[in-house]
């Protein structure tokens, strides 16, 4: 068994090897001419038949799923189902599920290692999560319980399968839902083997298999032993990856169903026994299990994640959006025929001026209501639906290609720097600093606030001078490259090499795309 004690394993160095890791949110599929011809032929002859048969099997699952829970009360469903329902329906769903994946082209599921019993490991954690085909891992795990969105209950067949599974459901619209999910996971995980195992995809979203995203702590809150489960698709062509940017659902399904044979490897690693410290700290526990799995996979463990609907990467100590919303604003304004350079700023340095959507449209000379609403939504609004025009002025300045980076950073400082007392020097405090980084880089405000505290010299005022701010944004070996890459919206999608890969001695190891290896914790 893997232990949480020091010396149990060595952290993976993502910079070792011949090349750095590519961006985990982007999947590019390059087909040769011969491959294109093959996919065209098989896509017409093979894929439609496979998909049709798979959908027929999917609907055949419904009677078994319905029968297992038919007539049971909510109180009865709070306990694991046993007896004939469990035997007949469980085996029926298991067999039909294997047939479904077989029809989609997954002719072989190769299993390595030994699945632990529910007493040894009440929780299974599977990674990397790269595709909607990943539920295939449920088959060698004997259909463990899963965690899913409550909204999926309304999806035909899928909802019935979730009820059959007695899945733990979380609602995005109910703030108390997450607390109930945590309590339910803890209840099942500490039931002494009464409940089947619970399987998590701790990354929470799909990547391209090239790096592990940051693990969410939900699977580790109970503090019980977990068994890591690795998922690999060792096929000559990666048609299964479904990343934030790359082939969509239908294309991934069509390409995979057009392959003569797809293979999936499922590997059970030794059970990870948490230390006392890890059992009390789910984040530490999650980070250490993530690095164990990354080492076994031979890929880096990163702190990349989704914040809301945006993918976030890490550069040094700062989290930044992979593509700041500022770039999307540029597309909206360009489509409306607006040139940011001719807009009269009218923003007063150091003082906020809150404006309504109507005033925003008048200031930017926009007439189309849809364009106005779309552009206005990019800025943070207060309780009255107003935005600070300083944010608008800085965004327009950043989109004005006629300004140098030095002029732009000076303007940012002038707009948000404040005087503590009459006649004192104007300094950039944490609120203004976090606003600038959030607007220009898409950085979450808490991360920017933490970085601001580190940049301020100990014993001095908790603010940055213009010189200090420009040294940070223009001349810092790491963050200066970040600003130069982000402060101009691209005419075409940037390659990942344009995001800085330098690292400072005090920062975690940075990758070519700006991601970092998870900071070393106990056990390094």
Swiss-Prot record:
Identify the residue span(s) of motif HXXXXD motif. 129-134
Instruction: Name the major location.
Output: endoplasmic reticulum
Catalytic activity, EC: 2.3.1.23, 2.3.1.n6, 2.3.1.121, 2.3.1.67
The record's catalysed reaction(s) read: a 1-acyl-sn-glycero-3-phosphoethanolamine + an acyl-CoA = a 1,2-diacyl-sn-glycero-3-phosphoethanolamine + CoA; a 1-O-(1Z-alkenyl)-sn-glycero-3-phosphoethanolamine + an acyl-CoA = a 1-O-(1Z-alkenyl)-2-acyl-sn-glycero-3-phosphoethanolamine + CoA; a 1-acyl-sn-glycero-3-phosphocholine + an acyl-CoA = a 1,2-diacyl-sn-glycero-3-phosphocholine + CoA; a 1-O-alkyl-sn-glycero-3-phosphocholine + acetyl-CoA = a 1-O-alkyl-2-acetyl-sn-glycero-3-phosphocholine + CoA
Q: Record's Gene Ontology CC terms? A: endoplasmic reticulum; endoplasmic reticulum membrane
Residues carrying a glycan? 152
Give the UniProt record's GO annotations in the biological process aspect.
Answer: phosphatidylcholine acyl-chain remodeling; phosphatidylethanolamine acyl-chain remodeling; phosphatidylserine acyl-chain remodeling; phospholipid biosynthetic process; phospholipid metabolic process
Query: GO molecular-function annotation terms?
Result: 1-acylglycerophosphocholine O-acyltransferase activity; 1-acylglycerophosphoethanolamine O-acyltransferase activity; 1-acylglycerophosphoserine O-acyltransferase activity; 1-alkenylglycerophosphoethanolamine O-acyltransferase activity; 1-alkylglycerophosphocholine O-acetyltransferase activity; lysophospholipid acyltransferase activity
- Keywords, alphabetical: Acyltransferase, Endoplasmic reticulum, Glycoprotein, Lipid biosynthesis, Lipid metabolism, Membrane, Phospholipid biosynthesis, Phospholipid metabolism, Transferase, Transmembrane, Transmembrane helix
Q: Which tissues does the record link to its expression?
A: Widely expressed with much higher level in brain. Expressed in erythroleukemic cells but not in reticulocytes.
Pfam families per UniProt = Acyltransferase
Region annotation (Disordered) maps to 490-524
Topology class, membrane? Multi-pass membrane protein
Q: Name the residue ranges with Polar residues bias.
A: 495-518
- Write out the transmembrane intervals: 40-62, 87-107
Q: Where in the cell is it found?
A: Endoplasmic reticulum membrane
Q: In which pathway does it act?
A: Lipid metabolism; phospholipid metabolism
Which family does this protein fall into?
A: Belongs to the 1-acyl-sn-glycerol-3-phosphate acyltransferase family.
Function summary: Displays acyl-CoA-dependent lysophospholipid acyltransferase activity with a subset of lysophospholipids as substrates; converts lysophosphatidylethanolamine to phosphatidylethanolamine, 1-alkenyl-lysophatidylethanolamine to 1-alkenyl-phosphatidylethanolamine, lysophosphatidylglycerol and alkyl-lysophosphatidylcholine to phosphatidylglycerol and alkyl-phosphatidylcholine, respectively. In contrast, has no lysophosphatidylinositol, glycerol-3-phosphate, diacylglycerol or lysophosphatidic acid acyltransferase activity. Prefers long chain acyl-CoAs (C16, C18) as acyl donors.
Q: What is this protein called?
A: Lysophospholipid acyltransferase LPCAT4
Q: What lineage, starting at the top, does this entry show?
A: Eukaryota, Metazoa, Chordata, Craniata, Vertebrata
